[in-house]
Design a protein with these regions (language model features):
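Active-site neighborhood of glycoside hydrolase catalytic domains
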Residues: 338-344, 354-356, 360-456, 463-471
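Flexible, acidic glycine-rich loops studded with aromatic residues
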Residues: 442-458, 464-598
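Bacterial N-terminal signal peptides that target proteins for export
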Residues: 1-9
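Flexible loop/turn segments at secondary-structure boundaries
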Residues: 62-63, 232-234, 260-266, 332-338, ...
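Acidic, contiguous N-terminal accessory segments
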Residues: 14, 22-191, 195, 199, ...
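Sec-dependent N-terminal signal peptides
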Residues: 8-18
Length: 598
């Protein structure tokens, strides 16, 4: 039975129009481009049609980003876009030209001008990669804009199942099958909200708004850290996490591979690191702060590590998405799993276990020649597997009580003329830095490496607020800003109704409000702020799905913090663009936090 139902139609129209707002003459790209202008013209900048082809210059037609763009256009429009080397009209030009100036290695330019080809130009393949990402957003939102405009002539007929004309029951509405008359210029069947089916007709052209974009990142370091020691994450998810980083035009993956609760990387010269160190017998139940003197455990063994072949595969996967993987092997503290495997490298001789509980542990490496030889062996095995110029040594939360109580260490300090244990950690860091330098690597450490004296070439990752980063840049060192106040994505996202987390509260607006360049430093010092990083520690994150939930869309907010001009940032405007950007999270099957979009 077919009949008009004005109440239901009104509800549907209001809901649809509220969701699909106009995007004409407005930026909807995320992160916000550095410069975007809209030429004054009534003509569309480019007509995307089934006759459109891709003209590729300076890059391979087999470039996976280009083949992915072709697939994306087909999914969005139904058009089978071909590739061509001919410079004809109705082309999308993808050009890599090292002679293009002012864009840098990661920048790109998009020109959409009437009567001209749509052009995406970049100095490098990396820049082209980011330009293609922005082009995808332009194409998708062109489709959204057109769908909205054609909704004006929507004539809906509803086949109901016993729906009263005055019904306000949402379940009644969802039971209705919606069909259309006069819904022109649409080329596919859409499923609104998963239940209402709308039949669409065919359209041959998508008119893309005229615009010129010149874009490049504000910071060279745009990173995310994932802890896989507390809870191991499978290879397939590590690749997906890399995809999520790339989706946000971020370029650094800090991989926290070792800690007290697990050693996650194969070292062939030291097989016990994975035979013993990758396994813990069980894990703390509930929150650490409530464990008290009688903690409860789940009785479930937890184990996992990455082979060197798997890591090579992951590093290659990341490189194709222009992401640099920075490994972290934590030392001299957070080394219980290491010392459980090889007790001779620990300060005390007593046997220890791979920790089942969170928090700061007593175990600390013995700063002797034997230990430094071991560390060099690690670096020799890892230096080529991880081609990054950076190597993170942790250095945080090293509890030095064992050093203070060891007669051997006290004698060592006298011989080295070291006055206190903080200075001994500085000595330890300096020795490791020399090993890394020998193999062409630069040392990164958490801000505790400042205590006892900062080594000349060390890069400080400032997590206990901003003071560590400020101290570093004033001393002539570089810094990466990642304070717990804004950048810890394992913190709660709301005051109530959230899954268990380590503590704190960092909502979407808090992340977006962060400014990586702190006040109180001059321009020269500010130039040594490399960028910022979000961190996902996994004490209370057992699954890939929860990693995604905790990370997104806070990672989306961070992407704009590290990419866009400070003066361009506006949270309300960001929230509007975020609603459109949600589509890209959906098609990548990301388990984001839906409440952040409300």
């Amino acid at each position: 039975m077919l009949r008009k139902n004005k109440n239901i139609l009104t509800f549907f129209l209001i809901f649809y129009i509220a969701t699909y707002t106009s995007v004409a003459q407005k930026n909807y790209i995320l992160p916000e481009p550095q410069n975007i202008t809209f030429p004054e013209t009534e003509k569309p900048g480019f007509r995307l049609s089934k006759k459109t082809s891709l003209n590729v210059t300076g890059s391979s037609l087999t470039n996976p980003q280009i083949t992915d763009l072709i697939k994306f256009i087909k999914n969005e429009t139904g058009f089978e876009v071909s590739t061509s080397k001919q410079n004809k009209k109705s082309n999308i030009e993808l050009v890599v030209d090292e002679n293009i100036h002012n864009l840098g290695d990661e920048g790109y330019k998009i020109s959409i001008i009437p009567n001209e080809n749509l052009k995406v130009h970049a100095t490098t393949e990396n820049g082209l990669f980011y330009g293609i990402q922005s082009l995808k957003q332009i194409i998708h939102f062109t489709k959204r804009k057109r769908d909205e405009e054609n909704f004006n002539d929507f004539d809906v007929e509803i086949e109901t199942k016993k729906i009263e004309s005055n019904s306000s029951n949402v379940n009644d509405f969802n039971a209705a099958n919606i069909t259309t008359k006069g819904y022109k210029n649409i080329n596919e069947t859409a499923h609104f909200y998963g239940k209402e089916e709308v039949q669409k007709k065919t359209l041959d052209i998508y008119n893309i708004t005229s615009m010129i974009i010149e874009d490049y990142p504000r910071f060279s370091y745009r990173g995310m850290m994932l802890d896989v020691s507390r809870h191991f994450m499978p290879v397939d998810f590590i690749k997906k996490f890399i995809d999520i980083i790339a989706l946000h035009k971020m370029n650094k993956f800090h991989w926290h591979l070792t800690d007290d609760q697990g050693w996650r990387i194969e070292i062939k010269k030291y097989p016990l690191l994975t035979e013993i160190g990758s396994y813990r017998s069980e894990t703390l139940k509930g929150h650490y702060r409530f464990a008290g003197n009688n903690p409860k455990y789940d009785g479930i063994p937890h184990q996992g590590f990455y082979t060197q072949d798997e890591i090579k595969e992951i590093v290659l996967y990341a490189s194709k998405r222009y992401i640099e993987i920075i490994p972290e092997v934590d030392m001299p503290g957070h080394t219980s799993a290491l010392i459980a495997s090889y007790p001779e490298f620990g300060t005390n001789s007593e046997k220890v276990e791979v920790k089942r509980i969170w928090g700061i542990q007593d175990e600390i490496l013995k700063p002797t020649e034997k230990t430094f030889s071991f560390i060099e062996d690690l670096i020799v095995e890892l230096k080529d597997i991880f081609p990054s110029e950076y190597f993170h040594i942790g250095g945080d939360e090293a509890k030095k009580t064992q050093w203070e109580n060891s007669s051997e260490i006290q004698e060592l300090m006298i011989n080295l003329e070291i006055e206190d244990v903080d200075s001994l950690q500085s000595y330890f860091t300096g020795r490791v830095e020399k090993i890394l330098s020998k193999y062409g690597k630069k040392l990164i450490g958490w801000d505790e490496i400042i205590e006892g004296g900062l080594n000349e070439n060390a890069i400080v990752m400032s997590w206990r607020g901003e003071e560590g980063g400020i101290t570093a840049v004033k001393a002539g060192n570089k810094a990466i800003m990642t304070p717990t106040s804004h950048m810890y994505f394992d913190y709660y996202q709301a005051k109530a109704g959230e899954p268990i987390a380590i503590g704190g509260l960092i909502d979407l607006e808090k992340v977006y409000s962060y400014e990586p360049v702190p006040s109180g430093i001059d321009l020269n010092e500010a130039s040594r702020i490399m960028g910022a990083q979000g961190n996902i520690w996994t004490e209370y994150i057992k699954t890939p799905e929860k990693v995604e939930y905790m990370g997104v869309p806070r990672m989306t907010a961070l992407s704009e913090v590290v990419w866009s001009k400070r003066k361009n940032r506006d949270f309300n405007e960001f929230k509007t663009r975020l609603k459109f950007y949600r589509y890209f999270l959906d098609i990548n099957k990301i388990n984001y936090r839906e409440k952040s979009f409300q």
